[in-house]
Curated annotation (Swiss-Prot):
This is Sugar fermentation stimulation protein homolog. Belongs to the SfsA family. Pfam families: SfsA, SfsA_N. It comes from Maridesulfovibrio salexigens (strain ATCC 14822 / DSM 2638 / NCIMB 8403 / VKM B-1763). It comes from the Bacteria. One of its GO terms (molecular function) is DNA binding.
Length: 239
C-alpha cells in the first residue's frame, strides 16, 4: 500500500451521518450529540450521503471557526471515499515532489493557483532550463463510480466546462495541458466523463483530448492515517 502523502490531523474520528441541510454543512451524531460538520464539496455527492452511515471527520484547525469539524470521507459501503475537494490540489504538488507523478518528469517547480488571463488554474509546472513548455494542470476530485467507471462530474458544472475551454486555448498556444482527476475511492477500473449527468461537459472533454489536453486519472489510497496516490486509471472505452 502506498504511504500517505497527505496526513489527516490529530483528533480525527468517525461519526454517524444524519443529513446535509445546507450547501456547506452536514449534521452528524458524535458521542450522542448532534454536531455541525463543514463540507467544502459543492457537488451532489450522488449516492454517498445516506442517513445512519459512518463518516470520517477532522477537527477544525481554526479554533474560532463556527463549525468545529470538517468532512473528510464517507463510508456508504464500508470503504472510505474521500470527499474533501482540497485534496487533489495538494496531492498534485506532493506527488510531484515525491517523484510519483511521471507525467511531470523533467519539470523542476510547480506553482499552485497560477494565473492565466482572468482566471486561475490549479498547477503550473516549469523547468529551470526553460527548455520544456509550460505545463498547466487543473485538478478535479472524483467520488462517483457508475458501472465500474469512475466518473466526473457528479453534478452539472459550468465551471468545469469553462476550465476545459481554457485548457484547449492554452494547448492551441503550444503549452502542455492536463486534467488531474483524483479518484478518492478504489472500486473503479477506468475513468470517463459523466455524460449521463453533464453531456455538454462530456462532449467538451473529448474535444479537449483531441486538442491535446491530457487526462491523468489516479486512484487514491485511503486510510484513517491519510491519503496516498495509487494506480493510474485508463480512459474508459465508451466514447
Amino acid at each position: 500500500m502506498s504511504e500517505p502523502l497527505i496526513f489527516y490531523p490529530q483528533g480525527c474520528c468517525r461519526a454517524i451521518f444524519i443529513r446535509r441541510y445546507k450547501r456547506f454543512t452536514v449534521e452528524a451524531m458524535l458521542d450522542g450529540e448532534v454536531v455541525g460538520v463543514h463540507t467544502n464539496n459543492t457537488g451532489s455527492m450522488l449516492g454517498l450521503l445516506r442517513e445512519g452511515q459512518e463518516i470520517y471527520i477532522s477537527p477544525a484547525q481554526n479554533p474560532n471557526r463556527k463549525l468545529k469539524w470538517t468532512l473528510e470521507a464517507v463510508m456508504p459501503f464500508g470503504e472510505m471515499i474521500g470527499v474533501n475537494t482540497s485534496v487533489p490540489n495538494k496531492m498534485l504538488q506532493l506527488a510531484f515532489e515525491a517523484g510519483q507523478l511521471p507525467e511531470a518528469g523533467g519539470y523542476t517547480a510547480i506553482k499552485r493557483e497560477a494565473k492565466v488571463g482572468n482566471s486561475r488554474l490549479d498547477g503550473l509546472f516549469t523547468d529551470d532550463s526553460g527548455k520544456l513548455p509550460k505545463l498547466w494542470v487543473e485538478c478535479k476530485n472524483v467520488t462517483l463510480v457508475e458501472d465500474d467507471i469512475a466518473c466526473f462530474p457528479d453534478a452539472q458544472t459550468e465551471r468545469g466546462r469553462k476550465h476545459l475551454v481554457e485548457l484547449m486555448d492554452l494547448a492551441a498556444k503550444g503549452d502542455r495541458v492536463a486534467l488531474f482527476f483524483f479518484v478518492q475511492r478504489t472500486d473503479g477500473s477506468c475513468f470517463g466523463p459523466a455524460d449521463f449527468i453533464d453531456p455538454e461537459y462530456a462532449e467538451l472533454f473529448y474535444k479537449a483530448l483531441d486538442a491535446g489536453v491530457k487526462c491523468w486519472a489516479y486512484e487514491a489510497v485511503l486510510s484513517e492515517r491519510g491519503i496516498g496516490i495509487g494506480r493510474k486509471l485508463p480512459l474508459a472505452a465508451c466514447r
